[in-house]
A protein has these predicted regions:
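N-terminal accessory/interface modules of nucleic-acid-binding and processing proteins
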Residues: 1-188
Length: 188
């Protein structure tokens, strides 16, 4: 085979495998940081998190809940039906703040998309990430690498989508900037 005297054939094949989220295993929570960046404890981030939470609840009438999800990869989500944000309770202050700014952006930007405003998931994620980055910059915080990577991935996905024009991307950035300004101008 290696001397090419025997005919060889290469095949690609797939088989079913089992994959687990670390939260579905018996790995103790205190060991999670060995495998995942759960953020870090910070009094400044905790205060900003509380400030953002208060903004959501008072200005947007959007409740913010911390829950235990059965997944480390699910960090949070905005539910337009109940106008609420659910965040994973397993993360530390820095990650909770980053996720809350992202989900707050969804609450502002995507609460009431009408049927004529069809946006791809990548476009909505890009808008929420851009708003989150602007808010974290406004607070003087370093942007987490995971947020930067997510923003870049969503941008690449949008650029690859032939139905999304450069004008649409510009509109998304304008939309994100208006959402950022609505928070920055009204946060206590």
């Amino acid at each position: 085979y290696k001397q090419h005297s025997i005919e060889a054939e290469q095949r690609i094949h797939f088989k079913v495998g089992t994959v687990f989220d670390i939260a579905q295993t018996n790995c103790p929570k205190e060991d999670y940081p060995k495998y995942f960046d759960l953020g870090y404890t910070s009094e400044q981030h905790k205060q900003l998190y509380e400030l953002m939470k208060t903004y959501c609840e008072k200005e947007l009438n959007c409740k913010v809940h911390e829950n235990q999800f059965n997944s480390v990869s699910l960090r949070g989500f905005f539910d337009p039906a109940s106008n609420s944000i659910s965040l994973s309770g397993m993360f530390d202050d820095s990650t909770k703040l980053s996720v809350l700014t992202h989900e707050t952006a969804h609450a502002i930007l995507h609460k009431e998309l009408d049927k004529t405003q069809i946006k791809s998931e990548a476009q909505m994620e890009f808008e929420a990430d851009a708003t989150s980055v602007m808010l974290q910059s406004y607070f003087g915080l370093q942007i987490p690498e995971s947020r930067q990577r997510h923003l870049a991935d969503q941008y690449k996905t949008m650029c690859a989508d032939k139905s999304i024009s450069s004008a649409d991307i510009t509109k998304s950035l304008d939309h994100s900037h208006r959402a950022y300004k609505s928070v920055a101008d009204n946060i206590n």
